[in-house]
Structure formats: structure tokens, C-alpha cells
């Protein structure tokens, strides 16, 4: 067993056990799932409800003044200002954005030195801001006069009293953690602990105290022991009550003068006004709510077609709850991890969750309802999950692989989308496995088996398409009707689509192909590829710079890499470069401080990194507040009992401050315990975690090497994952038996396929067929040309029927018996007995005359067989107590007297019958059929009207052994019947008159097969030879001649051995040794004749000149059946159970397939399928172009060869007293038609499809004429 098979088995077993668990304990699992949903949705309280997010409006800073309170616009005048933009805001927010770094980085610096010195400068900056005073002609303005004065905090915030300002200006900075006391900060040995002591015990959330004081999200601050960034970012937040433009301008100018930012190009042009809503905006909810309503309606109306579901609306509601809970859990978990769903991917994310969740619901529902309904509920759930386990895990693994690749693209938008997608997939998988599966088990448990049996026939566990309205007679017959005659073996679902209601076909198509998920995955891959190709992060440029700087020629041997000025402008660097660590070396164009270049070029002894981490500014720094939680400002003002509902605040342009700190200052500002505490890097960790990179030439650390190696490692990992993904897609799309015939699908009974595997039960009807009776023994040969039907039984009797009405037109008796029309039920050979009793008198008898010896008047009409016989009921002995002496007897013959074969010995009834004949006034009768004549005794001759002329060598009467031989083959065209006998005799009969037109008995070898095509007759013989005959006739072979009904008792006027004046048969060609053994199959089409023999070969002849074109070898057994059509497609089947397809034009074998366990008994083709049957009573349908088996139909015993093709997409098969119609394209059972009680015990041995959409079924000695139901004609 391979690794894949073992893994698949373990996954299947795990899902099976999980299904048992969910179905066994549904209530506890639903309660547990509900608690998990509530726990994961708890962080949603920190998010705005849909439609309640803040709304923004921007105005220029220049000439800004607060809008008036009564700002009424003229009626009809368009206004760009929103309605809420009236009056002064609650407050003006001014953020001083500080970026600081210690440079150059020394080798003996600790990790705590990254943020201790930058944070200590916050106290100095706060002091500078508080001491700033504006002096102008109007006087002086200080911060206390323009800032927002706050009072006490809310009573419930006692733990924050020493951290947030009270009774003064609302000014926030990281120094608030230490009450703005530098000494307290300097004495703190655990800065990280102090910052995080007020954080929640769970994962970091938005709008925490750290975010309020730092003014930036925690991951952007750089305050961490394990960060690779050496830049610390924070803001000093000032809240003003009134807008004073001069004070703000002077404050900005002073800070930028004291702490310049040369490479900063942040724009200070606009104020952003943010309005906070109070009520839910219904308009924003309409699209999403409409989507979920449509989802509910679609699932509900679709599940109405699934009868295996008890509560349709309950299942639809459970599906909607599953999808909605998955969405809420995803957003809640993202919020818990600090991800605020504000990007474009987050906006489209609810709709992606709907699509993916809908498909997973459909997959589980389809899998569970397709399990056998007679199993216990928990076993059905377990089997359903187990059957889809591998598919579910493959899809989840594929999606996670794509997400992993996307995360390593280093593009922020893709990374954030991938994080959302991971959380969404995990939450959706959890809910599908626990919540929806459990709800489905509860629903199916309600669908009790007793409730099903009320609507289902006993022989199948399928819901009836029309459960009501059955007549009482139909219900009674259900108890005695045999089981379903078919067992259908279906290939994997990729090869077929069942004919279902359109809703279910759409649902199961989505569930089977997972189209939406695959389209989403493909779209994600394309999106990631486009972003990587366009290189928004500048990765290729960065790598090129790294390769240039790492050249073995040294840094001085190569000049700076020429980059066009439009690519990396010095004044406004590309914002995408902000994703690189600040310590990564930049191109010379970005280094705008020329005074530092000589210092960097000559590294000093003991310096760890010669380059200072460049502090860069980008446009994203202008509105850093957007990365904060939307509750950031409402939370801050709520602490002081100030509400922002239905009000707005104004955010002033950010003031950038850059701090470049000396390493010596970092060493001087270090706390004494820092060297002995956990700040020092442990020896067990690699130096690369703390240091920038390995040492380069000259003792320096080449940090670029680590980055280059990291990118190479990520690229290698992404390549490996991509290869594995392609392999998985190949295994998913290409089955294991791709290109190989047949499949490994196990054969199952119909009871194991509830509702035909997809909730659809084919209808069952019962009709009274047109029964054609008249044969005494089993019918062996059938032939038809569309208008006439010819049948021959083992007794040698040939009957001609009208295929339209079912009337018997004439009978051709076995030689020696009198031919009669079809008014009676058997040959009237009794007249021969009467003539024998009259001493061999051969007087002619006119048609319609009664026998001359009939004297007794008859009572009620009796059957024609006993119409001229006395009443023998008095001879019946009902005294069964008397023991008669035993006499040697033999079994009674199955046929009536005079129908062909005489008995050698038996009981002599003449002693009993002779007395009755004498009483009736009839002469003594000899019983020649019961007393065989002695050899050499002369036999009385019948008249010429009896069909046998009194010539020498004429055949004996019916009770004597026939020298003409039995009929082995039969063909019909027009009004001519060609008969091939075992004696080698070829006969041509008139189908209407029953007259022998011509015959040929030159060869004594029996005729095993015949072809009658375009006035050419080809006879295949037992000795392997072929005879080609040409038929000449002066009359048309048009079927219009059949309209007249011949008169009864008409007989030929000439001898059976003489040729007719209108029809002549001439032997044109003979192939004496066409095969070495008897020919068993013969077909002709498109000017070609194909023969199959027991010598394992086929031969192709040209029909016009009997020239042998090809000898085809490919079977390992005798050929049993051959098919050829006008398109020159040749198929053959043999005793080896194989089917071969051949190219008639070249003689080459196209395909070879082992189809049956035994002989192939029948073979036919359509434009797209090859249909075969065998002695194993199995009907196989194969794809004609690929040779792959589509499905199999298991027939009843003895019905294996009973099949017929009505059209290219309609197949009819026979069973025990019924015929079934199948859709060849889809492989589903369309309808089963029962042929009444008389045929229930008889298997349909042979089916012949006529041109008028009628079907002739051979039930032994009777034929049933069935017309195709109208519903099938519509489908066709």
C-alpha cells in the first residue's frame, strides 16, 4: 500500500469516526458548536455593525474655518458637503509622528537599546510641546489655552487614573506609562512588562491602552525584543478644542526645526473630518442581506426535490446559519488577532464565504443522501463523510497551499487577504464538520424508514415520482411483482450525469465539480501572479541592488547602479518600499544626507553594521490613524464621558519628527539591570536572530546576505509548494484509470442506490401489450423490415405478422404440413387424418368448404383445432382410485399433433377413440401420428393444395421426419423471405402469399447466417464457405404491396421445386474456403461484408465481387457477434469476452477491451457508445472514442441478450415480464414498463426494435408488441 493510499485510508477512517460521533451525540455537539461560535464572535463587539463605520470628509487646510451651525444650502443647489458637516467638531486631533533609531548599530548593544533611548526622548518632546508659546501682535497663546481640557475619568476606570491625563490638557504619549516622569522610566528594569501590564490576557486586540498612548498599532511601534526592525515609531497626540491656525503652524515649524526629517515629503494640505454614526445604515446592509435571503430560498427550493430530507426549510436555514456563522467567526477571529477587515479583500470576503460555504453544504448533503437508506442514521452519516473525506481534504490542502504561496509574495494586500482566507477556511471547515453534519443527522433521523415505505415500492428504497393516484390493481400487483431486474454498476461520477430535475442537476454539478471553489482558487493564483509580475514591492529592483553590492569586486569597483529618476524619486520615495526592514541598505538615490556617507564608507573598529538604518517616510505615514481601530477615538473620548455619536472630529495633518540617536547615548541611558536580565541574547539562539547578519569582508556584517538568503529560501519553498500543488491537481483531474478501459467501481444493487443515487426515482408503468400467439414451440429467429415481422420457431413454422396491427398475415408450415392462414391457432393437419381414413382419396377441396365426413351438428363454436372432431369428453376417467397396470410411456410432446415431429412410440388411444368415431357416424380412423409407419410402407399423398406435390422425392407429411432440415437463419426484405436451412437449402418465399418463389440446394452444408441486401443474398455455411446469390425479380419490393390481405386457403399453383416466373435466384460467386471453421457471424453494410468464424478471425469482403480485403486477427476465441454500419465502423465480440473495434478502411485494430466473463452475445453501436451483452447477463456501455466503460446494467438470468437501441440516446432492455428504458447519455433509468401478469414469469429472451418506434419482445413461444411510451418520445 502506497503512502497516498495509507493517508487516504486514515483520513477516511477519521471522517467515519467523526460521523459516528456527530450522529450519536447530536445535542451535546450542537451545544459545543454554539458555544464556540459565541466565543469566536465575542470580538465582534469591538467592530462596528455593518453600516455604522465612520464616514470621512476632507477639506483643505488653507483658509479653513469651522462650518457654521445653520449651514443651509439653497434649494436645488448641489452641495459637496455632507449633511453632518455643520458646526464645530468635538475636537481637533494633532498627531506628532516620531520615528527614531539608534545608528550606527554597535556590536555590544543589547536588544533593549533599540527602544529604551527612543522612548526616553518622548519625555523631552512632551516638555517641548508643553512649553511652546505663540507670540504675535495679538499677544501670546500657550497650549493650555487652545487644548481640550478634560476632567475626571469615569468611575469604573480607576486602574487608568495614573496613566491617562486628568484635570488638564488631553495629551497622550508613551511617557504616560510612567506618569510622564523620566526618573521613573529610567528606573524601570522591565519596559516591555510595564507597557503590556494593562493588555488583555487574550491575544492583542484593537483600541487597547497601548494603542491609545502610542497612537499607532502595536505591530508598527517596533517595541519588541524579537523585532528585526531598529526603528521605533510612536505618536504624541494633542487634542485641541478650538482651531488656531497660527499656533499650529508655529508648533509644526518649531518641531521640524528641532528634529528635521530631510527625506520626508508628507503633505500637509487637508483636514480629515470623521463622522461617527449611531444607527445601523439599512442601505449598506441590503446587498449582504439580499445575498443570504437568495441563498436560503435557493437551498430551500432545491431541497424540495430531495425526498430524503424531512424538513426542507430546516435544512435551508441550517445552511444559512452555517454560512453566516462562518462569516461571523472569521471576522471575529481576525479581530482577535488584530486584523481589522477594512481592505478590499475584507469587503468581498462575506460573498466568498457564501460561495464556499454553499458548495460545502451541497457536497455534504449529496454525499449523505446518496447512502443506502436501509442503514442506521449514524452509519449513513459516517459513510457519507467517509466517501467525501479525501475530496474535502484535498480541496482544503490545495486552498491552504495557494494561500501559503500568496503570503510569501511579501505584498501587504495579498498577505492580509491570505490571513483572512486562512481564518475563513478553518472556521468554515469547523462548522461544516460539526454543526451542519449534526443538523443533517437529526433531519435524516426524522425521516423514518416506516415513513419511506409508505411512499416506496417494496422492491426498492427509492421514493416514487408519483406516490399517489395508483390504482388498486397496481397496488395488489406490487406484492407479487419480482424484484427490480437490473443492477446498475456506475463508473465514477466524472464519466456521467444523471437526468435529474434541473435544480438538482445544477446543485450536484456544483457539488461534484466544486466549480466555484476552483474558480476562486484559479482567480487567486492569477491575482497573485499578476501582482508578483508587476512587482509593486520593488522586489526585483531590491534584489538587483543587493547583487550589485555583494559583488566580489568590492563596493568601490562598481559605480552606483543607474536608475531612472522616475523610478525612485528622491523627494517622494515609492511607498511600497516601506515593507522592507529599515536596516536594509537603500540605493544611493534614497540617501539624502551627504554628510553621513563618508562615515558609512569607512567602518570603525567594533561597529557591527556600517550603515545606519535609514528612516524613511512614505505617503502611508500621512494617515497612519487609518490603521487604528475605528473605536480608537470613541474609546478615548468615552473615558471622559464624551460621546462621538452623530458628531465628528477633525484630524489635522501629521507632524513628522525624525530622531537619529547616537549609540553612545544608548549605552549611557541603559539601565544597570539590562545587562543581567533577559535582554541579553541567550547563547542557545543563533546570532542571526539578534544580529543583522554574518560578517562580511573586512569584519563587517553583511545584512543583505540574510535578506537575500531569506528571499531565496522563500522562493524555493514556494516552488516546492507549487510543484506539489500541480501534482495534486493532476491527481484530482486525471483519474487513476485514465486512458484505460473500465473502472474499479464495485457493483451495487439498486437498493443501495437510493433514488438512483441522486434522489430521483424513475417512474413505473404497466401496459397491456399486443400479444402475438401462434407458435407451438420457442421462437428462434426474428426478422423485420419495419412493416412486416417474420418469426420462426423450433418446430420450423414461419409466421408473418403485420408490424403495425399485429395481425398474422400468413403462415409458412414445415414441409409436409398444410399451410393455412392465421385464423386458427395451429396447423389443421387433422384433415390429413380424415383423408387417410377415406382410403387415400385426393379429391381437390375448394377454399372454405367443410370436410365431407362431418355429419354431427355442433353446438357452440369451438377452437379450429377441434372444429371437425367428435366430443371426446366422455373418455376422461375421473376415478383416480383405480390402479391401472403400468405401461411404458414417454413424456408428452410440447407441441400439438401434426406440428412437425412424430413420436417413435407411445400409448395407443385408437381403441378408445374408434368407438366414439363409430357413434358419430365416422369411419374408423388410423392414428398415423401416434403409430409410426414401417419402413418401406407407402404413404398416402396429400393433394397439391396441401403444399406438397405428388412427385418423386417429395417430402413426407408433417408426422414424418423432414428431409428439408430445420431453419437456422432468416432474413426479410420487402415481400420476400430468405430462409437458410440446416440441410444447406436456400429458399425464397413470398411473405404475403406464402408461396415458395425459388430455392437452391446445390450445397449440403448448413446455412448458419444470411445477408439480404439490395437484391443480393450472401449465405454463410457450416463448412466455412460463402455463397453470393443475385436475386432477379420483375416486381417491385416496395412495402406498399403489403396493404392487401391475402385470401385464406390460397396455395401456390406450381411445385415448390420449380422456379417462379417472377423471381429467380442465381449463384454468382462462391468463396469455398472463407474460413477454416464454421462461420458464426455475418454482417454487411457500406458495400462491405464482414464474416466471423470459430477460427478466431474476421474477414472483410467486397460485396460486389466477393473479393477478400482484410483478415482481422485479435481475438483469442471464436467470433460470436459482429457489427458494422454505414460509417464503416466495425466491432466484434468473441467467446473470450473481448470486444474489438476495427478500422475497415485500413484493417487495423483501434481498440481491444475485455468486456464480459464469458461469450459476447450481442453488440451494437451508436454515434457515441458501444453496447455489448454477454453470457454473464451484463450489459456494458462503453465510450466509443476512448474505450472507457461508462456503466453496466446487470440483467436477470436469461435476459442478457435482450437489448435494443431505439435512438442514439435511448436503450431498451428486457427483464422478468418487463422492459426498461435507459438514457444512454446519462446512464439513468427512465422508465420501467411491465407487460401484465401473463409475462411476469417469462424472461424477455430477445428484443427487436422496429422502425415505427415499436418493440418486439420474445417471451418463448409468444411475441409481445410494445410501443415506446410517449414520455420517452418527448425525451428523445
Swiss-Prot record:
- Phenotype seen when the gene is deleted: CHO cells show loss of site-1 cleavage of SREBF1/SREBP1 and SREBF2/SREBP2, reduced synthesis of cholesterol, a reduced level of LDLR and cholesterol auxotrophy.
Q: Where are the transmembrane segments?
A: 19-39, 280-300, 313-333, 345-365, 402-422, 424-444, 519-539, 709-729
| Topology feature Lumenal, residues | 40-279, 334-344, 423, 540-708
**Reported effect, residue 428 to E:** Very mild reduction of SREBF maturation. Slightly higher affinity for INSIG in the absence of sterols
* Phenotypic consequence of residue 449 to A: Loss of SREBF maturation and interaction with COPII coat
Q: Would you identify the family this protein belongs to, as annotated? A: Belongs to the WD repeat SCAP family.
What SMART domains does UniProt report for this protein, alphabetically?
Answer: WD40
Q: Which UniProt keywords apply?
A: Cholesterol metabolism, Cytoplasmic vesicle, Endoplasmic reticulum, Glycoprotein, Golgi apparatus, Isopeptide bond, Lipid metabolism, Lipid-binding, Membrane, Methylation, Phosphoprotein, Repeat, Steroid metabolism, Sterol metabolism, Transmembrane, Transmembrane helix, Ubl conjugation, WD repeat
Start-end of the WD repeats? Answer: 771-811, 949-999, 1002-1039, 1074-1111, 1114-1152, 1155-1192, 1194-1232
Name the reported effect of residue 298 to C: Loss of sterol-dependent ER retention due to loss of interaction with INSIG. Constitutive interaction with COPII coat and maturation of SREBF
Gene Ontology biological process terms in this record: cellular response to sterol; cholesterol metabolic process; COPII-coated vesicle cargo loading; protein import into nucleus; regulation of cholesterol biosynthetic process; SREBP signaling pathway
Which cellular compartments is it found in? Endoplasmic reticulum membrane; Golgi apparatus membrane; Cytoplasmic vesicle, COPII-coated vesicle membrane
Recorded protein name is Sterol regulatory element-binding protein cleavage-activating protein
This chain is glycosylated at: 263, 590, 641
Q: What does this protein do?
A: Escort protein required for cholesterol as well as lipid homeostasis. Regulates export of the SCAP-SREBP complex from the endoplasmic reticulum to the Golgi upon low cholesterol, thereby regulating the processing of sterol regulatory element-binding proteins (SREBPs) SREBF1/SREBP1 and SREBF2/SREBP2. At high sterol concentrations, formation of a ternary complex with INSIG (INSIG1 or INSIG2) leads to mask the ER export signal in SCAP, promoting retention of the complex in the endoplasmic reticulum.
Glycyl lysine isopeptide (Lys-Gly) (interchain with G-Cter in ubiquitin) crosslink site(s): 454, 466
Q: Which gene encodes it?
A: SCAP
Print the domain comment field. Loop-1 binds to loop-7, enabling interaction with COPII-coated vesicles. When levels of cholesterol in the endoplasmic reticulum increase, Loop-1 binds to cholesterol instead, thereby disrupting direct binding between the two loops and preventing the SCAP-SREBP complex from exiting the endoplasmic reticulum.
Mutating residue 315 to F leads to what result?
Answer: Loss of sterol-dependent ER retention due to loss of interaction with INSIG. Constitutive maturation of SREBF
So what does mutating residue 640 to S actually do? Abolished interaction between loop-1 and loop-7
Q: Where is this motif: ER export signal?
A: 447-452
**A Gene Ontology CC term for this entry?**
membrane
Tell me what topology the record assigns in the membrane: Multi-pass membrane protein
| Signal peptide (residue range) | none
The record places domain SSD at 284-442
Omega-N-methylarginine-modified residues are where? 1048
Please list where the region (Loop-7) is annotated.
Answer: 535-710
Amino acid at each position: 500500500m502506497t503512502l497516498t493510499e495509507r493517508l487516504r485510508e486514515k483520513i477516511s477512517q477519521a471522517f467515519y469516526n467523526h460521523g459516528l460521533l456527530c450522529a450519536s451525540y447530536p445535542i451535546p455537539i450542537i451545544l459545543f458548536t454554539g458555544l464556540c461560535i459565541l466565543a469566536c464572535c465575542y470580538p465582534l463587539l469591538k467592530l462596528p455593525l455593518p453600516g455604522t463605520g465612520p464616514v470621512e470628509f476632507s477639506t483643505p487646510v488653507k483658509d479653513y474655518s469651522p462650518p457654521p451651525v445653520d449651514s443651509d444650502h439653497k434649494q436645488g443647489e448641489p452641495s459637496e458637503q455632507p449633511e453632518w458637516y455643520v458646526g464645530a467638531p468635538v475636537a481637533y486631533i494633532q498627531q506628532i509622528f516620531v520615528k527614531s533609531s539608534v545608528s550606527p548599530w554597535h556590536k555590544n548593544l543589547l536588544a533593549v537599546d533599540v527602544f529604551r533611548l527612543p522612548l526616553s526622548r518622548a519625555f523631552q518632546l512632551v516638555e517641548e510641546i508643553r512649553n511652546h508659546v505663540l507670540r504675535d501682535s495679538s499677544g501670546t497663546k500657550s497650549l493650555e489655552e487652545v487644548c481640550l481640557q478634560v476632567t475626571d475619568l469615569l468611575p469604573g476606570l480607576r486602574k487608568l487614573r495614573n496613566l491617562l491625563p486628568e484635570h488638564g490638557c488631553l495629551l497622550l504619549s508613551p511617557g504616560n506609562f510612567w506618569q510622564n516622569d523620566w526618573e521613573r522610566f529610567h528606573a524601570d528594569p522591565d519596559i516591555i512588562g510595564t507597557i503590556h501590564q494593562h493588555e488583555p490576557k487574550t491575544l492583542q486586540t484593537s483600541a487597547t491602552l497601548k494603542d491609545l498612548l502610542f497612537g499607532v498599532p502595536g505591530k508598527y511601534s517596533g517595541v519588541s525584543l524579537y523585532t528585526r526592525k531598529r526603528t521605533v515609531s510612536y505618536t504624541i497626540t494633542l487634542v485641541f478644542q478650538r482651531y488656531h491656525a497660527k499656533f499650529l503652524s508655529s508648533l509644526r515649524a518649531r518641531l521640524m526645526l528641532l528634529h528635521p526629517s530631510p527625506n520626508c515629503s508628507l503633505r500637509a494640505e487637508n483636514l480629515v473630518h470623521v463622522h461617527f454614526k449611531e444607527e445601523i445604515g439599512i442601505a449598506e446592509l441590503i446587498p449582504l442581506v439580499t445575498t443570504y435571503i437568495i441563498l436560503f430560498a435557493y437551498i430551500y427550493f432545491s431541497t424540495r426535490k430531495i425526498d430524503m430530507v424531512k424538513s426542507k426549510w430546516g435544512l435551508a436555514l441550517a445552511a444559512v446559519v452555517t454560512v453566516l456563522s462562518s462569516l461571523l467567526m472569521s471576522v471575529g477571529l481576525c479581530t482577535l488577532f488584530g486584523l481589522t477587515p477594512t481592505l478590499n479583500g475584507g469587503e468581498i470576503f462575506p460573498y466568498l464565504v457564501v460561495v464556499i460555504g454553499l458548495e460545502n453544504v451541497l457536497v455534504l448533503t449529496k454525499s449523505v443522501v446518496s447512502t443506502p437508506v436501509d442503514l442506521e442514521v449514524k452509519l449513513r452519516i459516517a459513510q457519507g463523510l467517509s466517501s467525501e473525506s479525501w475530496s474535502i481534504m484535498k480541496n482544503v490542502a490545495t486552498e491552504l497551499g495557494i494561500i501559503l504561496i500568496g503570503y510569501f509574495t511579501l505584498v501587504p494586500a495579498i498577505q492580509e487577504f491570505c490571513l483572512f482566507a486562512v481564518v475563513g477556511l478553518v472556521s468554515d471547515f469547523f462548522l461544516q464538520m460539526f454543526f451542519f453534519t449534526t443538523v443533517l443527522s437529526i433531519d435524516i433521523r426524522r425521516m423514518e424508514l416506516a415513513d419511506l415505505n409508505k411512499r416506496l415500492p417494496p422492491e426498492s428504497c427509492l421514493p416514487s415520482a408519483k406516490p399517489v393516484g395508483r390504482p388498486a390493481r397496481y397496488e395488489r400487483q406490487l406484492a407479487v411483482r419480482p424484484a427490480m431486474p437490473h443492477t446498475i454498476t456506475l463508473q465514477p461520477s466524472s464519466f456521467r450525469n444523471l437526468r435529474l430535475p434541473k435544480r438538482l442537476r445544477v446543485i450536484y454539478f456544483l457539488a461534484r465539480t466544486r466549480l466555484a471553489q476552483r474558480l476562486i482558487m484559479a482567480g487567486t493564483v492569477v491575482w497573485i501572479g499578476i501582482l508578483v509580475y508587476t512587482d509593486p514591492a520593488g522586489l526585483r529592483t531590491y534584489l538587483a541592488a543587493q547583487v550589485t553590492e555583494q559583488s566580489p569586486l568590492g563596493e568601490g569597483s562598481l559605480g552606483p547602479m543607474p536608475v531612472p529618476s522616475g523610478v525612485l524619486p528622491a523627494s517622494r520615495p515609492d511607498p511600497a518600499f516601506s515593507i522592507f526592514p529599515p536596516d536594509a541598505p537603500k540605493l544611493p538615490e534614497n540617501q539624502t544626507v551627504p554628510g553621513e556617507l563618508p562615515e558609512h564608507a569607512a567602518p570603525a573598529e567594533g561597529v557591527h553594521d556600517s550603515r545606519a538604518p535609514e528612516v524613511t517616510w512614505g505617503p502611508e505615514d500621512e494617515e497612519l490613524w487609518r490603521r487604528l481601530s475605528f473605536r480608537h477615538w470613541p474609546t478615548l473620548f468615552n473615558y471622559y464621558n464624551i460621546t462621538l455619536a452623530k458628531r465628528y472630529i477633525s484630524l489635522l495633518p501629521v507632524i513628522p519628527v525624525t530622531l537619529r540617536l547616537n549609540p553612545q547615548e544608548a549605552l549611557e541611558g541603559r539601565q544597570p539591570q539590562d545587562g543581567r536580565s533577559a535582554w541579553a541574547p541567550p547563547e542557545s539562539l543563533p546570532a542571526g536572530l539578534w544580529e543583522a547578519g554574518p560578517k562580511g569582508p573586512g569584519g563587517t556584517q553583511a545584512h543583505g546576505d540574510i535578506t537575500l538568503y531569506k528571499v531565496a529560501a522563500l522562493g524555493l519553498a514556494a516552488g516546492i509548494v507549487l510543484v506539489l500543488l500541480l501534482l495534486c491537481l493532476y491527481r484530482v483531474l486525471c483519474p487513476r484509470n485514465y486512458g484505460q478501459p473500465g473502472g474499479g467501481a464495485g457493483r451495487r444493487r439498486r437498493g443501495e442506490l437510493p433514488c438512483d443515487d441522486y434522489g430521483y426515482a424513475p417512474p413505473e408503468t404497466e401496459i397491456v401489450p399486443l400479444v402475438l400467439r401462434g407458435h407451438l414451440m420457442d421462437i428462434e429467429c426474428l426478422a423485420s423490415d419495419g412493416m412486416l415481422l417474420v418469426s420462426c420457431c423450433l418446430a420450423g413454422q414461419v409466421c408473418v405478422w403485420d408490424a403495425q396491427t399485429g395481425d398474422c398475415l400468413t403462415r409458412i408450415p414445415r414441409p409436409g404440413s398444410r399451410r393455412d392462414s392465421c385464423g386458427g391457432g395451429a396447423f389443421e393437419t387433422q384433415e390429413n387424418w380424415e383423408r387417410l381414413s377415406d382410403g387415400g382419396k385426393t379429391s381437390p377441396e375448394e377454399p372454405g368448404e367443410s370436410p365431407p365426413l362431418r355429419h354431427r351438428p355442433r353446438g357452440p363454436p369451438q377452437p379450429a383445432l377441434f372444429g371437425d372432431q367428435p366430443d371426446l369428453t366422455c373418455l376422461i376417467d375421473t376415478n383416480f382410485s383405480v390402479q391401472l397396470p403400468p405401461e411404458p410411456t414417454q413424456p408428452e410432446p410440447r407441441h400439438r399433433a401434426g406440428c412437425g415431429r412424430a413420436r417413435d412410440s407411445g400409448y395407443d388411444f385408437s381403441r378408445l377413440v374408434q368407438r366414439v368415431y363409430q357413434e358419430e357416424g365416422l369411419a374408423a380412423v388410423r392414428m398415423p401420428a401416434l403409430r409410426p409407419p414401417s419402413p418401406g410402407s407407402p404413404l398416402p399423398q396429400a393433394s397439391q393444395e396441401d403444399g406438397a406435390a405428388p412427385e418423386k422425392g417429395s417430402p413426407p407429411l408433417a408426422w414424418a421426419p423432414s428431409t428439408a432440415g430445420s431453419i437456422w437463419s432468416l432474413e426479410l426484405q420487402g415481400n420476400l423471405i430468405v430462409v437458410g436451412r440446416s440441410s444447406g437449402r436456400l429458399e425464397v418465399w413470398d411473405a404475403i402469399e406464402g408461396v415458395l418463389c425459388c430455392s437452391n440446394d446445390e450445397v449440403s452444408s448448413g446455412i448458419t447466417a444470411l445477408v439480404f441486401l439490395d437484391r443480393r443474398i450472401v449465405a454463410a455455411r457450416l463448412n466455412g464457405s460463402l455463397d453470393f446469390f443475385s436475386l432477379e425479380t420483375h416486381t417491385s419490393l416496395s412495402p406498399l404491396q403489403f396493404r392487401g390481405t391475402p385470401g385464406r386457403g390460397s396455395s401456390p399453383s406450381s411445385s415448390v421445386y420449380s422456379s417462379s416466373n417472377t423471381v429467380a435466384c442465381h449463384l454468382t460467386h462462391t468463396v469455398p474456403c472463407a474460413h477454416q471453421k464454421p462461420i458464426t457471424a455475418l454482417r454487411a453494410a457500406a458495400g462491405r461484408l464482414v464474416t466471423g468464424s470459430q477460427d478466431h478471425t474476421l474477414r472483410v469482403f467486397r460485396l460486389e465481387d466477393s473479393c477478400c480485403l482484410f483478415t482481422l486477427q485479435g481475438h483469442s476465441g471464436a467470433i460470436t457477434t459482429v457489427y458494422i454500419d454505414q460509417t464503416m465502423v466495425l466491432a466484434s465480440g468473441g467467446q473470450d469476452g473481448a470486444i474489438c473495434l476495427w478500422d475497415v478502411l485500413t484493417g487495423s485494430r483501434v481498440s481491444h477491451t475485455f468486456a464480459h466473463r464469458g461469450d459476447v452475445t450481442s453488440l451494437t453501436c451508436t454515434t457515441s457508445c458501444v453496447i455489448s451483452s454477454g453470457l454473464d447477463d451484463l450489459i456494458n456501455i462503453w465510450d466509443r472514442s476512448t474505450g472507457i466503460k461508462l456503466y453496466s446494467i446487470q440483467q436477470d438470468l436469461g435476459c442478457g441478450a435482450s437489448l435494443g437501441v431505439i435512438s442514439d440516446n435511448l436503450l431498451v432492455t428486457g427483464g422478468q415480464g418487463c422492459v426498461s428504458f435507459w438514457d444512454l447519455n446519462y446512464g439513468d433509468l427512465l422508465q420501467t414498463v411491465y407487460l401484465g401478469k401473463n409475462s411476469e414469469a417469462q424472461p424477455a429472451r430477445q428484443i427487436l426494435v422496429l422502425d415505427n418506434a415499436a418493440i418486439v419482445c420474445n417471451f418463448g413461444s409468444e411475441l409481445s408488441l410494445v410501443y415506446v411510451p410517449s414520455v420517452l418520445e418527448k425525451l428523445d
